[in-house]
Amino acid sequence: MRYPSLARLPRRALSGLARAPVRLQSQNFLSQRCASTAALRSASAVAPACQSALHRQFQQRRYASATASAVLEAAASSPDNLTQEAIIDNLDPVEAERLSRVRNIGIAAHIDSGKTTCTERVLFYTGRIKAIHEVRGGDKVGAKMDSMDLEREKGITIQSAATFCDWVKKDKEGKEHKYHINLIDTPGHIDFTIEVERALRVLDGAVMILCAVSGVQSQTMTVDRQMRRYNVPRISFINKMDRMGANPFKAIDQINTKLKIPAAAVQVPIGAEDEFEGVVDLLRMKAIYNVGPSGEELRETDEIPEKVKAVAEERRNMLIETLADVDDEIAELFLSETEPTEQQLRDAIRRATIGLKFTPVFMGSALANKSVQPMLDGVIDYLPNPSEVQNLALDKKRDEASVKLVPYNSLPLVGLAFKLEESNFGQLTYIRVYQGTLRKGANVFNARNDKKVKIPRIVRMHSNEMEEVSEIGAGEICAVFGVDCASGDTFTDGQLGYTMSSMFVPEPVISLSIKPKNNKDAAKFSKAMARFQREDPTFRVTFDAESEQTLISGMGELHLDIYIERMRREYNVDCETGPPQVAYRETIGNHVEFDHLLKKQSGGPGDYARVVGYMEPTEKLEENVFEEQIVGGSISEKFLFACEKGFHLACEKGPLIGHKVLGTKMLINDGATHMTDSSEMSFKNATQQAFRKAFMESNPSVLEPMMKTVVTAPAEFQGDVIALLNKRNATINDSDVGVDEVTVYADCSLNGMFGFSSHLRAATQGKGEYTMEFSHYEKATPQLQKELIAKYQKAQADRHKK
């Protein structure tokens, strides 16, 4: 490891180094500081009494700047050795105080678990809005975070919405502390999963909401996978405690068993269903009730109702036992049979939550205005501030080596554009600042194309409203106008060559042909398509040259329907759509060898290329592989690049039914060139021809997308639901029968699920619901393969007749 040189520090900062002791052990409870920055802290020499206050301030600024620079160097040269604790310890005290009061959180859950309702209460209790409005917009207003008319009509969240609020939390002495919360409310429907992906990519923590009746559902498991992908700590909130059949402890068991993350209640409910009154805080052993017209006031008492005393004691013991499994300090106390104090429990929950080892579980009812404020206290107590989260970037100047980002305002800027929106003032770009300061009027550089951009306006977003600010520091989220970029772009101030890995973007599974009904709307149609693609990476637009149709692709029928409806409302463009098209794939069958010669010589410059090798299935179905094993230079390197390009072009449109190719390997081990007639174009074309011929000789197959499907319906319709799935050749994997509802888990082909929603509603008297998520590709049935091949061959023949 290259240690930061003390020679880089100002001379005055070094003057007292010999006298000042070097602290190797951090006072912070987290862990030992790294050696590279321990010496930096010790260099703060005591200024002579004669120095002026102004001179002391200047010296402190110089020292802070040198310390930040040394930490930045350690973050780049030895990121593994620079601990997050060392970064925190060397923070400027003012910055440390600011960051300790910031929380960047998201709210995520299954459909209809109450995310937006809960967010509405958070905004009301923090004073961000003056009145509570409900989700479906029945009062002609609708929830604040559902700003689109479509969201209010359908009662679902389509786009993630960002806001900020201040929460005042009281400590044990009753002293008030103000915390700043950047909050993103996300959709629950699987079709809008990219909105959850990009929110979690930039957040430091999350609140996972579960229904007290349904517990862990299909989209809960998807959200859990997304949180794990981005290492996002979470607290859990069991909502709808006032619903019939509410059972929070069953939900906690499901978090432990289905999500496989240790979880324990930090509250127990006082009553349930219609008798739900409040909660008991298991750390302080106090009963908490909401009072006031909208539950805006809390009443705490030491008198725990007799009916819940035994449950509270039992669940407190379970909390301590669970913590003992994930935290060393509590484990020692547990083994010595010592009762941990409230503060020890609080610290242990925070350590384990930030360490992704545990999730504390809160409970309440957002709709009934009960127990939302204690959950907000949990956000402050147990979720990390920006300085406690490790964020990495890639240094393009050092072969994309990993570097640690340091949340100091004084360091060079690094920020990530994670979401784009079109507004009345132009493109709105949401940015998370990880390092440095983003200032109005500053020039920043897009790391993707090194393009310089000026920042004309910076705003904080409150759903569809905005508040202008002059600058944003490290650890904050904002939006900027007038920046032309793509979702996932990294911005720097030009001093660093850093880029951040972008979010995971799933492949579309369904397509539709689309065109405007009126040709006069073609310009507006093109403008809408371009905008929607910029905003949503899972929405794709392609033009099929053979059929001369524009195709839109997305994550499901609802996803595409929403964009068609938005085009009508926002651009006044009515569209005609064709039937849904499944994103089939083609794959090779057997190992097959090829020896293909392309030879066209007609007096002038001709074409000559010979490629020899074999094709076979890959080990992983999800990838295509091109390899070369040329010995003796029979094909030069520049022609081999052309061969590889030809291979990838051939994979874009397979010869069987015209869809993309998967799971195919091509290896070229010999060939021949001509002194004058060989060219890159010749070898590219020869490779494509060899590919098509060998592929068709290999007994290829058509693959169809299989969807992980979860159907929920009242228990009396279990037989009807299973019969409906069997009719569509679904593979039923599991079922959960609850008190009043049944959940069936199955794998179904996407092709067989078109129109399923209307059949499900008819079979369950409108009470059934289902979600689908892409699972994997599987060989289509022989009958379907024959139909698809015949249809493609007929279309090709008809096209050649024209």
From Swiss-Prot:
Keywords (alphabetical) are:
Elongation factor, GTP-binding, Mitochondrion, Nucleotide-binding, Protein biosynthesis, Transit peptide
**Principal cellular location given in the protein's record:** mitochondrion
Q: Which Gene3D superfamilies match?
A: 3.30.230.10, 3.30.70.240, Elongation Factor G (Translational Gtpase), domain 3 (3.30.70.870), P-loop containing nucleotide triphosphate hydrolases (3.40.50.300), Translation factors (2.40.30.10)
Q: So which domain of life are we looking at?
A: Eukaryota
> Where is the protein found, in the record's own terms?
Mitochondrion
Coiled-coil spans in chain: none
User: Which residue interval is the transit peptide?
Assistant: 1-24
Protein biosynthesis: present as a keyword of the record? yes
Function text = Mitochondrial GTPase that catalyzes the GTP-dependent ribosomal translocation step during translation elongation. During this step, the ribosome changes from the pre-translocational (PRE) to the post-translocational (POST) state as the newly formed A-site-bound peptidyl-tRNA and P-site-bound deacylated tRNA move to the P and E sites, respectively. Catalyzes the coordinated movement of the two tRNA molecules, the mRNA and conformational changes in the ribosome.
- What family classification does the UniProt entry report for this protein? Belongs to the TRAFAC class translation factor GTPase superfamily. Classic translation factor GTPase family. EF-G/EF-2 subfamily.
> Which named protein is this?
Elongation factor G, mitochondrial
Source organism per entry reads Aspergillus terreus (strain NIH 2624 / FGSC A1156)
Gene symbol here is: mef1
